[in-house]
């Protein structure tokens, strides 16, 4: 299995499979920050120390199997082309920060549910990404990988403070739990404007699809914990679970109310967006995200039938600049990307329609 597997096999498990509450919760992610004992943190370490960490993981962990998760392959950032790095970021397998690290690397599981980033902000960042609302399952997998690593190396740990990290906000459990949610009805009814401040008051953060500093394109929001010290991993996840469950209920209520009070307007919006995606010859990323959000809402409400509900997950990633350029075989100017994006969307919708036609003929 090579890096090309991750680039060309475009659909990760969280995009391809449906999990619990997947009409609203697109994915659940757990990230654990860890550092090696008696080794300077990445903000201060030398090139030799950084290289030694990669060598250690190459020797101790590459090719070895974690029960239920599989084997890992090491990808060194200095051996990856800029375009390939961008694709890995767009698939949420690595962070933008890692792409800039001179001695960065990543261990990737074959099914792409688990990635272990090396020499990012911390020596080790374990990430587990699951489809739908599965925070507890993702935490279980992350802890399994964490134990597997800790059996072979010693972590920087304080009895008083917990796991020691480069950034003080990660000290303690080192845990970041997050979910990606599609909340179009709360946006359309403007309820989101009062909900976000209320969530922030609970010690949670609301961001866009690519985390800190990113925009909530396509009405997709990432909600995560902010506090890692003074709470157990279980409590952090349960607190987030509770808020997400309430958001799911509020979004479903808003969808029902929209459909009951503004059915024609909603159907018009959905079908207009579907028409744009089906027929456009050029389309920018923001318009793509808006139209995909409308179509996914239409699928979930039963307005549009015969389309996969995963189409939002897939095309939100596949129409990003890195994937588009990979799809076309080289660098593209912005207007060329808009043309390629439109072609890819039309092709994907055509595949869906052809699949439905073949099923009808079989019946």
UniProtKB/Swiss-Prot annotation:
It is an enzyme of class 2 (transferase). One of its GO terms (cellular component) is extracellular space. Its EC number is 2.7.14.1. This is Protein-arginine kinase. Residues 24-254 form the Phosphagen kinase C-terminal domain. Disulfide bonds: none annotated. Appears to be allosterically activated by the binding of pArg-containing polypeptides to the pArg-binding pocket localized in the C-terminal domain of McsB. GO terms for biological process: phosphocreatine biosynthetic process. Belongs to the ATP:guanido phosphotransferase family. GO terms for molecular function: ATP binding; creatine kinase activity; protein kinase activity. The keyword Zinc-finger does not apply. It catalyses: L-arginyl-[protein] + ATP = N(omega)-phospho-L-arginyl-[protein] + ADP + H(+). CDD domains: bacterial_phosphagen_kinase. It comes from the Bacteria. The gene is mcsB. A motif (RDXXRA motif of the pArg binding pocket involved in allosteric regulation) lies at residues 337-342. Catalyzes the specific phosphorylation of arginine residues in a large number of proteins. Is part of the bacterial stress response system. Protein arginine phosphorylation has a physiologically important role and is involved in the regulation of many critical cellular processes, such as protein homeostasis, motility, competence, and stringent and stress responses, by regulating gene expression and protein activity. ATP binds at residues 27-31, 92, 125, 176-180, 207-212. Keywords: Allosteric enzyme, ATP-binding, Kinase, Nucleotide-binding, Transferase. InterPro entries: Arg_Kinase, ATP-guanido_PTrfase, ATP-guanido_PTrfase_AS, ATP-guanido_PTrfase_cat, Gln_synth/guanido_kin_cat_dom. Coiled coil: none annotated.
């Amino acid at each position: 299995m090579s890096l090309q597997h991750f680039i060309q096999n475009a659909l990760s498990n969280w995009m391809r499979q449906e999990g619990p509450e997947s009409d609203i919760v697109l994915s659940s992610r757990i990230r654990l920050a860890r550092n090696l004992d008696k080794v300077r943190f990445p903000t201060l370490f030398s090139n030799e120390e950084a290289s030694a960490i990669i060598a250690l993981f190459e020797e101790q962990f590459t090719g070895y199997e974690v029960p239920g998760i599989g084997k890992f392959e090491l990808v060194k950032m200095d051996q990856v082309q800029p375009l390939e790095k961008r694709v890995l970021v767009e698939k949420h397998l690595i962070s933008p920060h890692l792409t800039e690290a001179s001695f960065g690397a990543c261990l990737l599981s074959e099914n792409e549910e688990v990635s272990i980033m090396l020499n990012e902000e911390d020596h080790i960042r374990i990430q587990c990404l699951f489809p739908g609302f599965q925070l507890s399952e993702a935490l279980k997998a992350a802890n399994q990988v964490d134990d597997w690593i800790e059996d072979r190396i010693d972590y920087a740990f304080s009895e008083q403070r917990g796991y020691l990290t480069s950034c003080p906000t990660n000290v303690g459990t080192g845990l970041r739990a997050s979910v990606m949610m599609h909340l179009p009805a709360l946006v359309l009814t403007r309820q989101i404007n009062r909900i976000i401040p209320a969530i922030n008051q609970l010690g949670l953060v609301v961001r866009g699809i690519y985390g800190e500093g990113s925009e909530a394109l396509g009405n997709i929001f990432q909600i995560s914990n902010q506090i890692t010290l003074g709470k157990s991993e279980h409590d952090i996840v349960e607190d987030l679970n509770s808020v997400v469950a309430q958001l799911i209920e509020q979004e479903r209520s808003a969808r029902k109310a929209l459909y009951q009070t503004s059915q024609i307007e909603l159907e018009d919006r959905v079908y207009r967006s579907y028409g744009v995606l089906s027929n456009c010859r050029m389309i920018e990323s923001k318009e793509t995200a808006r139209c995909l959000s409308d179509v996914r809402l239409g699928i979930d409400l039963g307005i549009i039938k015969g389309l996969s509900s995963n189409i939002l997950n897939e095309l939100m990633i596949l129409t990003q600049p890195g994937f588009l350029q990979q799809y076309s075989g080289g660098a593209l100017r912005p207007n060329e990307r808009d043309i390629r994006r439109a072609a890819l969307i039309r092709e994907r919708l055509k595949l869906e329609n052809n699949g439905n036609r073949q099923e009808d003929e079989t019946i």
